Structures are given as C-alpha cells and as structure tokens.
Amino acid sequence: LSNPPLCRTGPFKPHLAPFLLPQDPSEALREGKAAGIPLIAGANAEEVAFPSLQALLGPGDWEEAERRLLESGLSREKAQALLAHYRKGVPDPKRAWGEVQTDLTLLCPSLKAARLQAPHAPTYAYLFTFRAPGWEGLGAFHGLELAPLFGNLLERPFLPLFLRQEAQEEAEYLGKKMRRYWTSFAKDGEPKGWPRWPLYREGHLLRLDVPLGLLPDLYEERCGALEVLGLL
C-alpha cells in the first residue's frame, strides 16, 4: 500500500528476454503484432485501494503522499505533477492515494492495452465496480470478480463476503451475466449479452455491477496524465 510503482520496479512484471519476450508488449500491440486476435481488457475499481484500509494506512496529507512517491523512486517533479492531477478531482489524500495505486498498477495499463489493440482487432473493455453488500469498505478489490464469474461464492477466500442472502443473490445475478459474455467471447470472439457490450473504440466500457451498465471511456480522465509523465 505504500509503494504504487512496485509492480514496475519489482519482480512481478514482464521481463524482456530474447528467447521468450523479445519486445515490450506495448510496442508489439502498437505495431499490430497481435492483429486479428480479439481482446477483453479491464480492471476492478479499487484494485489495491481497499477504502477502509486507506483510512488507516493512507497518507495523512499531500506532503506525506509526495514523500511516499519519492521513496518509491519517482522524481520530485513527477511526484508533484502526479499528485496535482489527482488533487483536482479527489481532495482527500487518502482516497487519492488509493486511486493512484489502482491506476498505476492495473487499471491504466489494462486500458492502455485495449487502446493499442483496438485498431487491430475487436477489443472490449470493462470496469468491475461491484462491492459485496455488507463489505463495501473493501471496495471492488483485486480478484473479487472471480467469485461471481466462476460461481465459487461459498468457497474460501470469498465465503465470508457472501454469507448474506442479499450478497449471494446479487453476485449470482452478476455471475450469470458475466459468464454469458465470457463464454460467447471464447466461442465467437464477441461478448454477447444485454446490455450490448460495445467495442472499445466506440468510447465506452462495460460496468460490471448490479445493475450492469455502460461507462464513458476513463482513459483520458484517469490515465492521460500518467502517460504524459511516462508512468505507463
């Protein structure tokens, strides 16, 4: 929670190697090396934010947030520019810190992949925003989408989140919708269901929640500044 660029500087990232991964994936997508291969890309709204934990572990003020970014390896200029971008829309530094982490680690890299692939193949993007009723403080955290998608609501580690009937019913409803999209995509290369899942180039993402819906593309709002700063 204290090191947002961790996935870019630590071992848990793609490593270029001539025998296995000879080219940066972003460059390969941009050049059309995966042309003709349909893609679904997306992320969860609070991948690594955990709103209730940010209240305890997030930075107490913007100065502390800047210090954390400096400790993670960002230059002062980039750290200040990054925080200025988030400060415009999120006045609370704790909440902003959660968004910074989510955007840097998963949301923006996923949407960037969709943007790069969209000219070359049918590409679809989503944002998973479902929060388990009664556990809203955990947010739509990393991996939560697996419970409704595979229907393993009463298996560990998800069991405590779905003991309530309301939580089970909502997750089961969402899971049926998700499986319809995912299986038709695997079969036909197009995620079929209702609402219609538009192509990413049409400017919308599918919002996976109860109820389902569409969202305008978040890239420019959430990720444009990160790309300008060279953080994507």
Enumerate the language-model features and the residues they cover.
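Substrate-gating cap/lid region and adjacent catalytic-acid/histidine neighborhood
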Residues: 1-169, 181
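Enriched - but not universal
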Residues: 65, 100, 185, 197-200
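Tryptophan-rich aromatic "cage" segments
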Residues: 213-232
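Mature extracytoplasmic/periplasmic domains
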Residues: 188-216
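Generic structural motif
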Residues: 131, 153, 211-213, 231
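Non-catalytic, well-ordered alpha-helical segments in soluble enzyme domains
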Residues: 171-193
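A short alpha-helix capping/helix-coil boundary motif
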Residues: 90-93, 158-162, 200-205, 209, ...
